Curated annotation (Swiss-Prot):
Biological source species: Salmonella typhi
Residues modified to N6-acetyllysine: 609
The protein's name: Acetyl-coenzyme A synthetase
GO BP annotation list: acetyl-CoA biosynthetic process from acetate; chemotaxis
Cofactor(s) the record lists: Mg(2+)
Lineage: Bacteria, Pseudomonadati, Pseudomonadota, Gammaproteobacteria, Enterobacterales
Entry-linked Pfam families: ACAS_N, AMP-binding, AMP-binding_C
Gene giving rise to this polypeptide: acs
UniProt GO cellular component terms: cytosol
Processing and modification events after translation: Acetylated. Deacetylation by the SIR2-homolog deacetylase activates the enzyme.
Length: 652
């Protein structure tokens, strides 16, 4: 399919869309030319305790990066997601939970969710948790994860959700960095029929001598299997919630009070604790949810993301619940126990809006018609894609097979740091091109710049930057504002640098080309090459390592690691397995290298810098243009690496 082919806006969408093409142009112009008026109006999507007078107060200036929105307003996120819906829609389903086992599912109304959140808020207060304290949440995909997050927001505690796939070492690092006082977990998680030892991982993390801030661990009973128990520290969820009062008055929070920390991989060193605040974030999550998914009251919405990622925060929970929507939470995986599981869930719950990742789409695509076998999917109206650029072939398959050629695909580009959608179609306003994220959302001013920071006009390619602030933008990195400025605002002055490259076509549509820094995107999850390299080098037999990403049909990118062993050590199949398991234990299963390339030396400049550009090309099998190798200390290394590469079995 030609990249210039446009999919027209379907008549059934055009007839009742919230934003049509003319409205998009008008509103977008206003949002750029007069952000105070535009976002002042959009802020009314929420209920405020103290209405704001100021809207935007932001600076991207070097040495003075400061981001404030609605700074004199007060509100409570949980009240906006729950309390305000009770009078008219208290009996509406807030969360549909679909278990890993298809025989397990339940509907939780707004009234029931409100009661549970109030009880858990009182539980937190009884344990001495107060406004500003950090609570670590390491939970499976169960409604109690949402209860824990909303209860933190209700009392003004800051939540730090840790993805359930992370290792004890990764958990410990996040607890130490944020000084979390409490950990909320479950005995085990369940995924694709297998149990995940969540409590054991937390126990192991808390054995780290540098973890000194944690006072209690609240444990939800999910599987009921035996776990270790530390009397006094460990507390059962049910015991606490049963004796807690269902009455709780939400805390008035300033719009700029911290809401959550979410750790994301950086290209250097330890993961970064991205900090989002309350008001601007929720305005942005709710506004983007409403317009991008063309949400109408009564729609059943399903975002397949885990709560441990920003998508789970903004578009599984907070955006939908702020809008009074019914959101589906799925414990399992899209292709287990059958390739048609995702479509079976769509039919079972009559899902209207489906938001998933290219990785899932490609995995289902590989199954062919088995992915849709015996399913109807006629309830679907809007499809969405998130986590990484979607290749046109997968886009077309998704549109054709899952959506039966009648559902617009909103391919959303955004990041943990942006809080919400940045470049995305609006279903009733923008014609679609397979593989393009299309146009910017309201208030978002993207630009493409060359490596010197000069803006590139017209149809071109370059580094993707944003030239002015938006309400959902992260305010800082927890405890390290200097690193925040250094990471996002130092490469190009007075601009937010996304770390992604993009091209813009003759219609002004954006095509994301992927990371330009040393961050990998594996199955929609960001992993820093530095973090994986550090784990490899920590192995007693490894001298040096360099990690690059290679294209992978299902995961988007696979992890290719060049490894130099210590003098006297020899490669072996046993060591290969040992090293892969080592990384798995250090970081988590996601970071396990797909390929280990044993080598005696790496291509380095005379100053000792590893030439990653060359390593990327060799790993990808692209040897046509290795570029200038004259700066290498030993140009012969490249030939040797190419020879070694011939013998390596690549992942399919």
């Amino acid at each position: 399919m030609s990249q210039t082919h446009k999919h027209a806006i379907p008549a059934n969408i055009a007839d009742r869309c919230l934003i049509n093409p003319e409205q998009y142009e008008t509103k977008y112009k206003q949002s750029i030319n007069d952000p105070d008026t535009f976002w002042g109006e959009q802020g009314k999507i929420l209920d405020w305790i103290t209405p704001y007078q100021k809207v935007k107060n932001t600076s991207f200036a070097p040495g003075n990066v400061s981001i404030k929105w609605y700074e004199d307003g007060t509100l409570n996120l949980a009240a906006n997601c729950l309390d305000r819906h009770l009078q008219e829609n208290g009996d509406r389903t807030a969360i549909i939970w679909e278990g890993d086992d298809a025989s397990q599912s339940k509907h939780i109304s707004y009234r029931e969710l409100h009661r549970d959140v109030c009880r858990f808020a009182n539980t937190l207060l009884d344990l001495g948790i107060k406004k500003g304290d950090v609570v670590a949440i390491y939970m499976p995909m169960v409604p109690e994860a949402a209860v824990a997050m909303l209860a933190c927001a209700r009392i003004g505690a800051v939540h730090s959700v840790i993805f359930g796939g992370f290792s004890p070492e990764a958990i410990a690092g996040r607890i130490i960095d944020s000084s979390s006082r409490l950990v909320i977990t479950a005995d085990e998680g369940v995924r694709a029929g297998r149990s995940i030892p969540l409590k054991k991982n937390v126990d192991d993390a808390l054995k780290n001598p540098n973890v000194t801030s944690v006072e209690h661990v609240i444990v939800l009973k999910r599987t009921g299997n035996d776990i270790d128990w530390q009397e006094g520290r460990d507390l059962w969820w049910r015991d606490l919630i049963e004796k807690a009062s269902p009455e709780h008055q939400p805390e008035a929070m300033n719009a700029e009070d911290p809401l959550f920390i979410l750790y994301t991989s950086g290209s250097t060193g330890k993961p970064k604790g991205v900090l989002h605040t309350t008001g601007g974030y929720l305005v942005y999550a709710a506004t983007t949810f409403k317009y991008v998914f063309d949400y109408h009251p009564g729609d059943i919405y399903w975002c397949t993301a885990d709560v441990g990622w920003v998508t789970g925060h903004s578009y599984l929970l907070y955006g939908p619940l702020a809008c009074g929507a019914t959101t589906l939470m799925f414990e399992g995986v899209p292709n287990w126990p059958t390739p048609a599981r995702m479509c079976q869930v769509v039919d079972k719950h009559q899902v209207n809006i489906l938001y998933t990742a290219p990785t899932a789409i490609r995995a289902l695509m590989a199954e062919g018609d088995k992915a849709i076998e015996g399913t109807d999917r006629s309830s679907l109206r809007i499809l969405g894609s998130v986590g990484e650029p979607i290749n046109p072939e997968a886009w077309e398959w998704y549109w054709k097979k899952i959506g039966k050629e009648k559902c617009p695909v909103v391919d959303t580009w955004w990041q943990t740091e942006t809080g919400g959608f940045m470049i995305t179609p609006l279903p009733g306003a923008i014609e679609l091109k397979a593989g393009s994220a299309t146009r910017p959302f309201f208030g978002v001013q993207p630009a493409l710049v060359d490596n010197e920071g000069h803006p590139q006009e017209g149809a071109t390619e370059g580094n993707l930057v944003i030239t002015d602030s938006w309400p959902g933008q992260a305010r800082t990195l927890f405890g390290d504002h200097e690193r925040f400025e250094q990471t996002y605002f130092s490469t190009f002055k007075n601009m937010y640098f996304s770390g992604d490259g993009a091209r813009r076509d003759e219609d002004g549509y954006y095509w994301i080309t992927g990371r330009v820094d040393d961050v990998l995107n594996v199955s929609g999850h960001r992993l820093g090459t530095a973090e994986i390299e550090s784990a490899l080098v920590a192995h007693p037999k490894i001298a040096e390592a360099a990690v690059v990403g290679i294209p992978h049909a299902i995961k988007g990118q696979a992890i290719y690691a060049y490894v130099t062993l210590n003098h006297g050590e020899e490669p072996s199949p046993e060591l290969y397995a040992e090293v892969r398991n080592w990384v798995r234990k250090e970081i988590g299963p996601l970071a396990t290298p797909d390929v280990l390339h044993w080598t005696d030396s790496l291509p380095k400049t005379r100053s000792g810098k590893i030439m990653r550009r060359i390593l990327r090309k060799i790993a990808a099998g692209d040897t046509s243009n290795l570029g200038d190798t004259s700066t290498l200390a030993d140009p012969g290394v490249v030939e040797k690496l190419l020879e070694e590469k011939q013998a390596i079995a690549m992942p399919s």
